[in-house]
Structures are given as structure tokens and as C-alpha cells.
Amino acid sequence: MKGPNLNFRKTPSKDNGVKQVESLARPETPPPKFVEDSNLEFNVLASEKLPNYTNLDLFHRAVFPFMFLAQCVAIMPLVGIRESNPRRVRFAYKSIPMFVTLIFMIATSILFLSMFTHLLKIGITAKNFVGLVFFGCVLSAYVVFIRLAKKWPAVVRIWTRTEIPFTKPPYEIPKRNLSRRVQLAALAIIGLSLGEHALYQVSAILSYTRRIQMCANITTVPSFNNYMQTNYDYVFQLLPYSPIIAVLILLINGACTFVWNYMDLFIMMISKGLSYRFEQITTRIRKLEHEEVCESVFIQIREHYVKMCELLEFVDSAMSSLILLSCVNNLYFVCYQLLNVFNKLRWPINYIYFWYSLLYLIGRTAFVFLTAADINEESKRGLGVLRRVSSRSWCVEVERLIFQMTTQTVALSGKKFYFLTRRLLFGMAGTIVTYELVLLQFDEPNRRKGLQPLCA
């Protein structure tokens, strides 16, 4: 239920008719300012200066460093992402970012095809299938991010237009502003993912060198060329070996790992940006407690709440495919890692990497779910104050706002199949436990076999 259309540039009158009488006694009001259509997009009149977006606490300014970093590995091929003005962000097929994206997609497709042909030769099992799923998820993520990039200029314009009123009084900027929150969370995920990838490489290299040192039947001297041909043999069954191709494979593999992590990182940044504005609305509502408030204030609050809900719906329609892909990806890899919990490993470094990877994956999944669930939690936190509004301040707008907060599901979704709430996290945990018990029963014969001979 939408409220009346308001001009947010007008502040509600707190006097009972005094200012209206004074305005009638004044001479003619000056002619209205000319409104330019391009400026009206952000509620700015042509005779006024455009806002300095660099100094505003806006979502676009908070996320652009990480979106620019993602462009280095061919995610979100947008032009003008570093511009402070969101209206300069655009998508173009004929652009350098799009060209880089196509190159990375072709390279990832080669790795996917190499893995697929290799598995056809040796036979597909539940455990060696993980590599194919990994490259398949990365390729799907590239496609989803291209589709999202086409919609992003419209998304960031509507987002900026909606959140500009929140950068001015009566709304307050929290001590830890939006940029700070996004940066802390993003740097934590990037740092932990770099640690996970580094441990993977160290584990693979040490396992390779130990095997050569301990096996008398292996006369090969440890070298970069031999390491690549041993660990990435599935690629060189399709491509001829050369040191340049080997280095490129390592770079593409690292880029794929970044894309695999960036899906959750991007959802987390979106969730931070949306829940931050709902938190500001809640803070404003709480400050009105025990005060006599005129109806126009509640009209404005409900209007801003409705605008945020409309923004959430628009953002959700643009990125629900990414949310669905991320959840399926996390569900599969958590189940796969838990399946290997009882397996014996050969070297201590293998145990270190395995447990770090497992805990990181579970922690990242839970963190993203809880961050997204904060949107739903923040959208309802003002209910307690609204229900205690005094009879002197009670009005139909308060009743409408309570009804909307109570009945509407304000949350991101995966194609509307499910909503990212705290309840879903526990449901997903129960699903993982159920599948894991079934998988462990099927994998019992493989666990009894133990480790394969080292020098075979």
C-alpha cells in the first residue's frame, strides 16, 4: 500500500496553522524553478548545484573499489565504474571490460572442457566431479554477472535517487558509515579467500615434492614444468605444454577462485547497503518515542520505507539469479567438504588446508546468509516503537506502516523460491545434515580402502 506522493524537499510544518497564515500575508511567491528532466532523476532542481557525490555516504561510493577490483578478473564489465557520479556508469558490448570478460570466459571454458574430457576417460565419481562443478559454477557466474552488468546502470541510478534523502537530516549517519561497513566485511572475505587459495597451492606443492623425495621409483627432479604437468595433466591432454601456457593456467585458476568467492562477496555488499538504510529508518523511529509527532512526519517515514521496499524489489529482480547460483554452489561444496571429514590424509599440511577450507566455507556461507537476513530484521525493528505510539500521535499512517512491516516479506530471494532470512539458514543446515548422512553411507566402501599407495 503506497502513501501519497511527497516532495521530499519540503519539511513538514510543526505549527498549527501559524505558518499558513503568515504565508498568506506575504507577497506573491517567486516563479517556480525550472526543472531539468536529467536532474529530476536524482530530485535535483536545475538552478541548484548537483550534489558532490564524492562526499556523500552513498552505496555506489562504498562498493566501487571492490567492483573495480572485480573488473581486473573480468567481472561486471562496466564503463565509468570509478566515476563518483552514478549517472556515468554504463554498459557497452564494445568496451575493454567486455573484451577482457570474453577472454577470461574462453580460458575458463577450456579448463572446463579439459576437465570434462579427462573425467570421461577415467570415470566420473562423486569426489572427482568437484572440479567440473567448480569450473561450471565460475562459467555460470560470468554469464550471470554480464546480465547483471546490463541492468546495473539503471539499478545504481534508482538506488542513488532513493538513498539521497537518507544522507541529510533528519536522518543520521552512524559512526560506522556504509563505506566503512562494506570495506571491513569485503576485506575480511578477500583476505580469508587469499589465505585459502595460498594454502591450497602450498599443500599441492609440498605433496608433490614429498612424493618425489620418498619414492625411489620416481627419478624426476622437482621442477615447475613437472609440477604443472603432474597437477594439471587434464589441461595438457587437450593443450600442448609450454611454460607460458602453464603460467596462464595458474593465473586463470586464481581468477576462477576469485570469481567463486566474489559471488558471495557481492551479495554481502548489496545486503549491507540495503540493511543500512532500513537501520536509519529504525533509528529515526526510535527517536520519536515518547514525543508528540505530527502526521506529516509519519507520512514521510512511510514514504521512505515504501521507497526502500520498492528499491529492494528492483534489486532482487536484477540479481536473484546470482543468489540462486550462490546458494546452490555453497550447498554443494559444503556437502562435498563434509563428505571428506573422515578421510585419511597423507601429510599434516593436507589436514591444515582441509580444515581451514572447510571452516572458511561454512563461515562464509553463514556470514552471507546472516548479512542478507539483516535486511529482513532491520525492516521490522521499528515495530515495537510504532505500537507504543501515544493516542495523541496515533494516525492512519502509523497503522499503515505497522501493517506493512508486519505483513510484507522484506528480503532478497532466489528467484522467489526462497527468501534469505535467518529461518532459511537453519533450514539449509538441516538439509545439509540430511544429505550428508545419506552420502556417508554411500561412501563407506571408499573410506575403508584408505589411502592409495604413495609411489604407485
UniProtKB/Swiss-Prot annotation:
Inducers of expression: Expression is increased by starvation.
Outcome reported for the amino acid change (mutating F333A): Abolishes sucrose- and maltose-induced currents
Sequence ranges on the Cytoplasmic membrane side: 1-91, 151-182, 272-318, 374-421
GO biological process assignments: detection of chemical stimulus involved in sensory perception of taste; monoatomic ion transmembrane transport; proboscis extension reflex; sensory perception of sweet taste; sensory perception of taste; signal transduction
Region Disordered, annotated ranges: 1-30
Binding sites annotated in the UniProt record for sucrose: G131, E196, H197, Y234, T257, Y353
Principal location: membrane
Listed result of changing Y353A: Abolishes sucrose- and maltose-induced currents
Extracellular topological domain residue ranges: 115-128, 206-245, 343-350, 442-456
TM regions (residue ranges): 92-114, 129-150, 183-205, 246-271, 319-342, 351-373, 422-441
UniProt note on tissues of expression: Expressed in Gr5a-expressing sugar-sensing cells.
Residues annotated for D-maltose binding in this entry: E196, H197, Y234, N253, T257, Y353
Pfam families associated with the record: Trehalose_recp
Membrane topology type: Multi-pass membrane protein
Assigned keywords, A-Z: Cell membrane, Membrane, Receptor, Transducer, Transmembrane, Transmembrane helix
GO cellular component, one term: membrane
Cellular localization per UniProt: Cell membrane
GO MF terms held by the record: ionotropic sweet taste receptor activity; ligand-gated monoatomic ion channel activity; sweet taste receptor activity; taste receptor activity
Stored PANTHER family: GUSTATORY RECEPTOR, GUSTATORY RECEPTOR FOR SUGAR TASTE 61A-RELATED
Similarity-based family: Belongs to the insect chemoreceptor superfamily. Gustatory receptor (GR) family. Gr5a subfamily.
Subunit comment: Homotetramer.
Protein name: Gustatory receptor for sugar taste 64a
Taxon lineage: Eukaryota, Metazoa, Ecdysozoa, Arthropoda, Hexapoda
Gene: Gr64a
